[in-house]
């Protein structure tokens, strides 16, 4: 009975598209819920920030579609805390203009994906995303519905990006776009002019990530030799159960991280040099403010949360499903930039480079022999870059996962160099 009442409640919250233009501090775009499943009325929330001096209805500037990272996390954290959008939020929940926004030269769309994240609403239990192919299809359906409503938005180059666990879905989404495009012609409804992917601190192949924690902790002085050996034991247990019993492997992974937190913490796993959480502003106060919810075309009864635990739980079995083969195939047809944050423990630089080295891509040998160069912004070395054919890898120095919070200019410069083919030297 309680489950039936919950289903009725969800249906009552969002039953039709709510999206429309918004204007906050003079920053304009479109936002709201798009009903993806016409039978159950499950919906995804998006907000699209127009390029600061552009008009998405008339120009041809690129569109960057960004997916949330983290397990059950909202896209609003990426857009607002990482300084991707033209807005950021202070500790009182007030919005301010961000002059380092990526929207200076491109349009930015963020999506609360999958269902249940942020403002997005599932209406039936059957709509919860529990596998990657279904998630990719739901996202493509969402894009196709937007394309039907706003065809001009998609008459341009499209890039899809995200960090962390977004790496589980983005290669599958790109692969499905490529497959669908094969049956269509450019300009035809459903054809998406995908040009490239951007993957930050990406969780593509868990087996190449988990087995680095002992080495990374030891090399960074977070563990001594004895503690490193304990971590190795934990890792072997995780990896030994990853395929046969992913639930058990996930529990073991949590125990491994808890052990690291005990010996080296309390540790900020996405920026190990900080011993407290990143200050991302009071997003909940802003996003649950009735005035701003109304402006963003969010149904009044919908409540925003930074992380949705039920979504996180549903995704646990996906952690150990490698997307390396899918990404390898995508690389044959699209350019891909992978970047790594130096101080992210959870998906550390060793892990990201192992993920790359283990790609079964035809160009991997040429990439690994390509020159690695210093990456400079305004004359300062901010990282290193290595590129060959369709693959670019950027190592960003002195930052954790939320790069834009501490280095707002550098990630924008990196994105622009990749999208606009500006070169690195």
Question: What are these model-derived regions, one by one?
Answer:
Residues 2-425:
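Terminal and linker regions of secretory-pathway proteins
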């Amino acid at each position: 009975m309680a489950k039936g009442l919950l289903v009725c409640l969800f249906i009552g919250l969002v039953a039709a598209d709510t999206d429309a233009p918004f204007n906050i501090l003079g920053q304009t775009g479109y936002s709201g819920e798009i009903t993806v499943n016409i039978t159950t009325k499950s919906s995804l929330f998006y907000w699209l920030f127009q390029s600061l001096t552009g008009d998405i209805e008339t120009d041809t500037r690129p569109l960057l579609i960004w997916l949330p990272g983290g397990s059950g996390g909202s896209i609003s954290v990426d857009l607002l805390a990482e300084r991707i959008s033209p807005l950021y939020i202070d500790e009182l929940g007030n919005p301010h203009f961000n002059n380092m926004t990526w929207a200076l030269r491109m349009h930015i769309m963020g999506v609360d994906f999958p269902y249940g994240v942020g403002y997005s609403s599932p209406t039936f239990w059957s709509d919860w995303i529990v596998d990657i192919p279904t998630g990719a299809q739901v996202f493509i359906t969402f894009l196709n519905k937007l394309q039907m409503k706003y065809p001009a938005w998609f008459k341009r180059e499209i890039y899809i990006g995200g960090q962390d666990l977004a790496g589980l879905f983005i290669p599958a989404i790109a692969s499905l776009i490529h497959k669908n495009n094969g049956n269509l012609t450019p300009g035809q409804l459903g054809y998406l002019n995908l040009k490239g992917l951007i993957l930050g601190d990406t969780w593509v192949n868990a087996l190449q990530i988990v087995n680095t924690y002992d080495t990374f902790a030891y090399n960074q002085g977070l563990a001594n030799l004895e503690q490193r050996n304990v971590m190795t034991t934990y890792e072997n247990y995780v990896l030994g159960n990853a395929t046969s019993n992913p639930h058990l492997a996930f529990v073991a992974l949590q125990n491994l991280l808890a052990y690291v937190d005990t010996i080296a913490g309390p540790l900020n796993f996405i920026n190990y040099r900080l011993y407290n959480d990143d200050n991302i502003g009071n997003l909940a106060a802003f996003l649950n403010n009735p005035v701003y919810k109304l402006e963003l075309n969010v149904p009044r009864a919908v409540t925003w949360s930074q992380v949705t635990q039920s979504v996180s739980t549903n995704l646990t079995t996906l952690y150990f499903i490698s997307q390396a083969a899918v990404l390898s195939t995508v690389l044959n047809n699209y350019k891909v930039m992978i970047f790594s944050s130096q101080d992210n423990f959870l998906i550390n630089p060793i892990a990201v480079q192992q993920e790359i080295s283990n790609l079964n891509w035809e160009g991997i040998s040429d990439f690994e022999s390509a020159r690695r160069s210093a990456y400079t912004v305004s004359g300062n070395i901010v990282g290193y870059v290595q590129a060959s054919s369709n693959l670019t890898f950027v190592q960003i120095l002195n930052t954790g996962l939320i790069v834009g919070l501490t280095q707002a200019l550098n990630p924008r410069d990196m994105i622009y160099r990749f999208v606009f083919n500006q070169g690195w030297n």
